[in-house]
Amino acid sequence: MNLKTVTGAAVELSDTAFGREFNEALVHQVVTAYLAGARQGTRAQKTRAEVSGGGKKPWRQKGTGRARAGSTRSPIWVGGGRAFAAKPQDWSQKVNRKMYRGAMQCILAELVRQDRLILVDSITVSAPKTKELISKLAELNAPRALIVTNEVDENLYLAARNIPHVNVLGTNEVDPVSLIAFDKVIMSVDAAKQFEEALA
């Protein structure tokens, strides 16, 4: 596959990594699994057995005219336990390497097809200045973008940190969710070559 950088230089990349047919079901499964794995899963509530108190029967079974009650910690009482209490849970789903690789290939290929992938020889800023990076993004017509480089430059990272809807990641930090979350993906040629090597 032959792609061009912003300056017009030709870059030859493999069809396997950047030209695969889009498989929506695969991408959906991998993205869902990734988001599920990010859940903390630490929420916890108490059942009627776990709430403190409630050992004494509030009133006798018969003769009061009131509805019978055996505990003040029944789920229908204020201060009672939850009927179906949530417990800590591991939400992570298993995704094998072949599926993950396939989803990344599909996403990268779709970015190319939708003209959302911008290849650059390199993207750097002379100082950690937000203003300088904003002007560079404006030149590339990419105000909301993920910037992917093979090695994250500290100046670039600091300059992007204060811009909403802009993020800087190294190739080893990129995940399926971040690739689809941004309007544009600005990628250095070196980063594209690394993806090609990893996904081919």
Swiss-Prot record:
Q: Which Pfam families match?
A: Ribosomal_L4
**Disordered: annotated span:** 44-71
Q: Does the keyword Ribonucleoprotein apply?
A: yes
What's a GO cellular component annotated to this UniProt protein? Answer: ribonucleoprotein complex
Q: Which UniProt keywords apply?
A: Ribonucleoprotein, Ribosomal protein, RNA-binding, rRNA-binding
Q: Which family does it belong to?
A: Belongs to the universal ribosomal protein uL4 family.
Oligomer status and interactors: Part of the 50S ribosomal subunit.
What does the UniProt function comment say about this protein?
Answer: One of the primary rRNA binding proteins, this protein initially binds near the 5'-end of the 23S rRNA. It is important during the early stages of 50S assembly. It makes multiple contacts with different domains of the 23S rRNA in the assembled 50S subunit and ribosome. Forms part of the polypeptide exit tunnel.
According to UniProt, the name of this protein is Large ribosomal subunit protein uL4
Organism for this UniProt entry: Psychrobacter sp. (strain PRwf-1)
